[in-house]
Amino acid sequence: MAPLKLNSRNLSQIAAAGGALVKIPTYQRGRAVKEGIVHIGVGGFHRAHLAVYIDQLMQKHGVNDYAICGVGLQPFDSAMRDALASQDHLYTLIERSAKGSFAHVIGSINSYLFAPDNREAVIAKMAHPDTKIVSLTITESGYYYNENTHELQSEHPDIQFDLDPANEKAPRTTFGFLYAGLTRRYQQGLKPFTVMSCDNMQKNGSITRHMLESFARLRNPEVAEWIAEEGAFPNAMVDRITPQTSETDKTALAEKFGIVDSWPVVTEPFTQWVIEDQFSDGRPPFEKVGVQVVKDVHAVEQFEKHKLRLLNGSHSALGYPGQLAGFQYVHEVMANPLFRKFVWQMMQEEVKPLLPEIPGVDIDEYCNTLIERFTNPTIMDQLPRICLNASGKIPQFIMPSIAEAIWETGPFRRLCFVAAAWFHYIKGVDDRGKPFEVVDPMREELQAKARAGGNDPSELLSIKSLFGDDLRNDERFLREITTAMNDIARDGIMKTLPKYIN
């Protein structure tokens, strides 16, 4: 039987052909359900995480008032619009592990709005009474958050554009849209929707609240006060490794499962979501599908810290040195005994001692689980994905551990090696002289500083929005990172790495 194009009409045939390896949604969609969630930033992670939890609620528990309306704000989001529209907003989740692979057609995304075509439609959707939650996966740079001052980058041209009352009906940024939608709800006497960040940032809800309230105060203090008093911005920790989809993935889906999908998602079996129970206008019963909903924001912060420092910090330790050494995939780096030892020792000796204990969580078991996930060869997680937008990641995943280790007089040599590897990575040339693309919103500034500094980290460390003042004035840190930078420049990653392994 020839592979079938994914759409509503072909679902039953796809299920029959796929047998036990393929699951399809059997719940109602379209006008039969309410779209209670508007999600900005429909990428791979959203479609492997929140959309899957909602799919499970719809499939297993009959929840029909929290279907998702996806939103794309950027011109490049037209590709997702077209892919989803071509298959009735269905897509395939491919779950891969050493035990095999399974395909799950997800139907929780009910519609999609492309803001550049109709910005008013997005604002109206947010203001609709059915909308209870606006969720976000907009990456770190989408929050316009200054890491040094912890304030909104109000001087940014896009924020300035959205702050101009003349542009209220045609915003550019997430905060411009959120403000416009909330203002309309305020005028209509509705409750504010919950703004639910699903991005990989510590205190993501608190940061979102502060950025939006800061934006609103610059536009209308009355609306800002209403948001501050009535709004909800739950903090959350999210986790599921989701590599970029390749053409090989699409071909394999057609050959093995008989599904032709314009943009499937590949992911691992592991998934986790810990979220603070803070919602302004109701929420789905997330607990029914394995979400850890907690009352105490401190508990969320502890889970966040574990995940960001151990998983994401270790990803950084594999990504930047690994790409410089010429590797392509995470599992390839982990197959190298030197890297495997390095990452394990960094987690155990430098990061673990800085982390709080969480009742019911065994940190050693968590670290072992991470090693197992990193070594999964079936998801083909590419290093360039790990290395994307590092200016928003390294200040969260690596530098705080270094700062805390210095404060507590603990070891941090391996963490400095990772930071030094990123400083070399910024130059866009690996140890063999092969150029690669550096994708980062701060690329021009970073590369200019890297060229000016050479093997001296002081130029890059002068970027206060990333590093502040304390670290660049600490002698121990400067000595360690300068040594690592010089060693990498002289000997390359693979010859330098043994110096950082016991």
Curated annotation (Swiss-Prot):
Q: Which SUPFAM superfamilies match?
A: 6-phosphogluconate dehydrogenase C-terminal domain-like, NAD(P)-binding Rossmann-fold domains
Q: Which family does it belong to?
A: Belongs to the mannitol dehydrogenase family.
- Parts of the chain that traverse the membrane: none
Asked if the Swiss-Prot or TrEMBL record annotates the protein with the keyword Amino-acid biosynthesis, the reply is no
EC code(s) of this entry: 1.1.1.67
Q: Does the keyword Signal apply?
A: no
GO molecular function annotation: mannitol 2-dehydrogenase activity; mannitol dehydrogenase activity; NAD binding; NADP binding
- Specify the species: Aspergillus fumigatus (strain ATCC MYA-4609 / CBS 101355 / FGSC A1100 / Af293) (Neosartorya fumigata)
Protein name in UniProt:
Mannitol 2-dehydrogenase
